[in-house]
């Protein structure tokens, strides 16, 4: 299944583009679930200037989606119309410390940012050690773990709007709430400044070890999974509601509710995106019927179903 190839026209309109532009590029290898169709266009910018140039020249009617690390994402089987942007570690992966401030590019792994802070004897960012994503995704969804979240440490973030204009957002402008940012969905975040707190190496390492031990004991980290599937309802745990509804181990096609942690869906090997999304919706329906609680997706679902591209 493929889309009309618009890359020749885009390249002709952007003679100074330095990044990589590919048509009908498979996205499944770029997501942790390893499912989904192609992007009509996949663009990997060389750096911030290249990203701004691309957006400023891209026709306004062409939709744009930034993929992030692909750890909390389902790309539907029909693929993604328009442009998918993937920020590379080479151009957007910096992580360095100045005083008590950690500078992190959007493509920097959350775990690496925690390690960089720890090396500078800065605490407060240990929770990132257990999050399987990048800083760009953390900004977009206010990623958190172990009682801490991005809103607790963010100073400000840099982003580009759909016209290619560079903008700076302080913490308040991000409009953070639980696993959500109210910032314009069209923004593409490129970097952030995070506030650390001086702490002893032993204290920081103990917290990071605790985070890692919890992940290994409680989460199916060696499976093809997208992380936590549903947001925790206020005062409740999504996994408990899912378990109470009898969904532990539930299967649809090649998708399964994890036996280890009910709020994780896994690709057992041959799942389609439709299998995973259908399983998630089945879980939501059973939980609603059993407890009256309507679970909200934490995993982002993008693209079109098979046959719709």
From Swiss-Prot:
Residues 34-199 form the FAD-binding PCMH-type domain. The lineage of its organism: Bacteria, Pseudomonadati, Pseudomonadota, Alphaproteobacteria, Hyphomicrobiales. Its main location: cytoplasm. GO terms for cellular component: cytosol. GO terms for biological process: cell division; cell wall organization; peptidoglycan biosynthetic process; regulation of cell shape. InterPro entries: FAD-bd_PCMH, FAD-bd_PCMH-like_sf, FAD-bd_PCMH_sub1, FAD-bd_PCMH_sub2, MurB, MurB_C, MurB_C_sf, Oxid_FAD_bind_N. The gene is murB. It is found in: Cytoplasm. This is UDP-N-acetylenolpyruvoylglucosamine reductase. SUPFAM superfamilies: FAD-binding/transporter-associated domain-like, Uridine diphospho-N-Acetylenolpyruvylglucosamine reductase, MurB, C-terminal domain. Cell wall formation. It is an enzyme of class 1 (oxidoreductase).
